[in-house]
Curated annotation (Swiss-Prot):
Tissue-level expression: Expressed in the embryo of 15 day after pollination. Expressed in kernels at earlier stages but at very low levels. Expression in the embryo peaks at 15 days after pollination and then declines. No expression is detected from endosperm and vegetative tissues.
ATP-grasp domain location: 116-332
Family named by the database record: Belongs to the ITPK1 family.
Mutagenesis / variant outcome for changing K70A: Strongly reduced InsP6 kinase activity
Stated name of the protein: Inositol-tetrakisphosphate 1-kinase 1
Superkingdom of origin: Eukaryota
Species for this entry: Zea mays
Effect on the protein of changing K29A: Strongly reduced InsP6 kinase activity
Effect of H192A: Strongly reduced InsP6 kinase activity
Any one GO molecular-function label of the UniProt entry: inositol-1,3,4-trisphosphate 6-kinase activity
Binding site for 1D-myo-inositol 6-phosphate: K28, K70, G161, H166, K198, Y200, N280, N299, G303, K306
Record-annotated disulphide pairs: none
Length: 342
């Protein structure tokens, strides 16, 4: 349970308790996440969002009733340990050791393979075939890549949120491997109709939104393409076809969202396995098997401001965290988890 609310004033007048939500975020993250609309909605529920002063020891700040963060480094980890020792009743979202698993693109997706599949679901899920490459010499190892089919997506092994970790390449042929800089992950590119499903998880709440993604690669594209093409996001790959030409063929609105129970199954399984409250995952539908879905990425504390109605969802989450041990436990037991599709 979070620490007690501030004491009532000595005048004897009863005021509703207020709770302090401390946030430790990088400037860019703070600018995108701490919107006036979120601050106002939290305040209307008796919760004040207060920034952590990174220049001062964390353990000496507060009092906080909940701490959310997305900072990294040994010093910050040590500060969290000191804070937890001094304020053991204050929830910290999320534990650094749990976040660490998402910094490696192999361990990140390995957890998906470990999830149980519900017997009553027609749809199935998994991850694309992939291998990790630690050095340039391995790129010439035909045996290592024998199990993969081109084209491939090359992603940096480390996923720490930096610009470098977002730099990816679509590799059409083996010749394109020479431009890559290990360590990296080579993942089979799977045609998915140019649509990606972004699933946001906030405690027990799940929201799925549709976004445009990489265009499918046809045999003609594959034969005429250069060795590799670099890009930073799955939604901005350069292509000779204009957006109107490609997306005129396949409408985002026509894409069918996976069943809510299916999405909730994966989201809940990941939440329990990862031990995280704030994350999202990207999922695609394999066009070769319409009821087969592949999780291709998992991100900690994503850009929630892009999620419809994020202010209400996050405010509810904060409220639950300061009022009971472990947000979402009661929800899952009562089957109150739900998926909002946008």
């Amino acid at each position: 349970m979070a620490s007690d609310a501030a004491a009532e004033p000595s005048s004897g007048v009863t005021h509703p308790p207020r709770y302090v939500i401390g946030y430790a975020l990088a400037p860019k993250k703070q600018q995108s996440f701490i919107q006036p609309s979120l601050v106002a909605q939290a305040a209307s529920r008796g919760m004040d969002l207060v920034p952590v002063d990174a220049s001062q020891p964390l353990a000496e700040q507060g009092p906080f009733h909940l701490l959310i963060h997305k900072l990294y480094g040994d010093d910050w980890r040590a500060q969290l340990v000191a804070f937890a020792a001094r304020h053991p009743a204050v929830p910290i979202v999320d534990p650094p050791h749990a976040i660490d698993r998402l910094h490696n693109r192999i361990s990140m997706l390995q957890v998906v393979s470990e999830l149980d599949h519900a017997a009553d679901q027609d749809s199935t899920f998994g991850i694309p075939s992939q291998v990790v490459v630690y050095d340039a010499a391995a790129l010439a190892d035909f045996g290592l890549l024998a199990a993969l089919r081109f084209p491939l997506i090359a992603k940096p092994l480390v996923a720490d949120g930096t610009a470098k970790s977002h730099k990816m390449s679509l590799v059409y042929h083996r010749e394109g491997l020479g431009k890559l800089r290990p360590p990296l992950v080579l993942q089979e590119f799977v045609n998915h109709g140019g649509v990606i499903f972004k699933v946001y998880v906030v405690g027990g709440h799940v929201t799925c939104v549709k976004r445009r993604s990489l265009p499918d690669v046809s045999p003609e594209d594959d034969a005429s393409a250069q060795g590799s093409v670099s890009f930073s996001q799955v939604s901005n790959l350069p292509t000779e076809r204009t957006a109107e030409e490609y997306y005129g063929e396949k409408s985002l609105e026509d894409a069918v969202v996976p069943p809510a129970a299916f999405i909730n199954q994966i989201a809940g399984g990941l939440r329990r396995a990862l031990g995280l409250q704030l994350f999202n995952f990207d999922m695609i539908r394999d066009v070769r098997a319409g009821d087969r879905y592949l999780v291709i990425d998992i991100n900690y504390f994503p850009g929630y401001a892009k999620m419809p109605g994020y202010e209400t969802v996050l405010t509810d989450f904060f409220w639950e965290m300061v009022h009971k041990d472990g947000v979402g436990n009661q929800q899952e037991e009562k089957g109150a988890n739900h998926v909002v599709v946008k």
